[in-house]
Design a protein with these regions (language model features):
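Charged, low-complexity helical/coil segments in non-catalytic cytosolic or luminal regions
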Residues: 160, 164, 205-404
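Canonical positions in the second alpha-helix
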Residues: 30, 63-64
Length: 417
């Protein structure tokens, strides 16, 4: 064991036994002679744990993250210092408490006309709620773009690992009826008075509320026109009457990823020939061991948040303009059914990492041509932030040639897959 590693080891032992002053001294001595990256990270983290001074602790934690942006413990401690994460909310993802399967009382927003009391629905102009009875409409605007949330903070709490399992009991403020919906539904109409309701997810402690939404921009008539045009252009002959497209908001996760992909292997180096004439030595080839990093930066990697229609939704995702996502507002869901996620954010983030590694692997093998036996590691990759976004989709099925074809229409621009 190197001298600096011995000092760090002693620092850890003293920190664990409660002698923080001695731990600090060992860590500081290690930093005086340290010559490798890993030991610096360990020493500075020990220093952050050996002090109660908030400024000193912050300085040490920020130094750790400057060396290693993916250092989970340092990010957690810094989030606690910043007040973004409460120690009581931190969970062990491997031993989460069981979720209740009992029906839960759900609070919901109800949209009625202030003039006649009839129900109001969101209009596909993306700007207004319209009364179905008297036509009264009022416009609303939601400024800005959908906000991103800190991935690490969500992962440290139960919200990053939860998915809905319990049913939801709605109490309709219109007629007083109570009715039950499955946990995967975020909006619906009252089964008795037909009044639209939208779940207030901020009341559901272990679920993440959507960060953004791309509003529906097509009417039913426009969706039918897009469907007919697509069927005709693909030469599809339906065997029976095709059901009208059904509108829905489908959830997706988007992730911003950074950091680096670490790669190792053997680089081929050629030595220049030496001497002249008969004494000239031929060029020789040798292999040099390399351990290097390839920087990555990925914005808005989209992953389905629902297990339904995942394969076909993956084909539809590239047709959306994600930059058009608005901050989530329950009024967008008035009379438009929506699903909440049943794929947790933690599971979706793993799929995002797999996709990014696959994407960069192809690029790296094309760009780094002088390294043999290349091996890759995603340990240096970090998921920086995420959004839960609701996408507008029209759904239907077509029976043709003995096959059931699932059709999805992009509710933003009419693209069909």
């Amino acid at each position: 064991m190197n001298r600096d590693n011995e000092l760090v080891h002693e620092a850890w032992l003293n920190l664990k036994t409660g002698d923080r002053e001695l731990a600090r001294r060992y860590a500081e001595r290690a930093l005086l002679i340290v010559d490798d990256f890993e030991t610096k990270v360990k020493a500075y983290y020990i220093l952050s744990q050996a002090t109660d001074n908030p400024k000193e602790k912050r300085d040490h934690l920020e130094t750790v993250l400057a060396y290693d942006p993916a250092h989970a413990e340092a990010r957690r401690e810094l989030a606690i210092l910043d007040g973004k994460l409460k120690p009581a909310d931190i969970v062990n993802a491997d031993s989460l408490p069981a979720q209740s399967t009992d029906p839960q009382q759900a609070k919901a927003n109800r949209f009625t006309c202030p003039q006649c009391g009839a129900r109001r629905v969101f209009a596909p102009d993306g700007k207004s709620l319209l009364c179905e009875n008297c036509g009264y409409g009022d416009q609303f605007t939601v400024e800005g773009a959908a906000n991103e949330s800190d991935f690490f903070i969500a992962m440290a709490t139960a919200k990053g690992h939860r998915k809905p399992v319990a049913t939801q009991v709605f109490h309709c403020n219109g007629c007083g009826a109570e009715f039950v919906l499955a946990a995967g539904v975020i909006s619906s109409t009252c089964a008795y008075c037909d009044s639209p309701h939208v779940v207030r997810l901020d009341e559901s402690r272990d679920l993440l509320e959507p960060d953004g939404i791309i509003p529906h921009a097509l009417t039913l008539k426009q969706a039918i026109e897009k469907l007919v045009s697509w069927v005709e252009s693909h030469g599809i002959r339906p065997e029976k009457k095709v059901d009208q497209p059904r509108p829905v908001y489908l959830p997706i996760w988007t992730f911003d990823l950074g950091g680096s992909i670490n790669y190792s292997g053997e680089r081929i180096e050629l030595d220049e020939p030496e001497g002249f004439g008969w004494n000239r030595k031929p060029r020789t080839m040798r292999f040099v061991r390399v351990n290097e990093q390839y920087p990555i930066l990925v914005n808005d990697r989209a992953i389905p948040a629902s297990k339904k229609n995942t394969a076909i939704l993956n084909r539809l995702l590239p047709t959306f303009d994600m930059s058009a996502a608005k901050p989530y507002d329950t009024r967008y869901l008035a009379n438009w059914p929506a699903e909440i996620y049943d794929i947790t954010m933690s599971d979706a983030s793993l799929e995002a990492r797999v996709q990014v590694v696959r994407q960069y692997t192809d690029r790296m093998r094309l760009e780094i041509t002088n390294v043999e036996n290349m091996r890759l590691s995603s340990a240096g990759m970090t998921v920086e932030s995420f959004k839960l976004v609701l996408l507008p989709v029209w759904l239907t099925e077509i029976q043709s040639n003995g096959e059931l074809i699932h059709v999805l229409i992009n509710g933003q621009n009419g693209r069909v897959v």
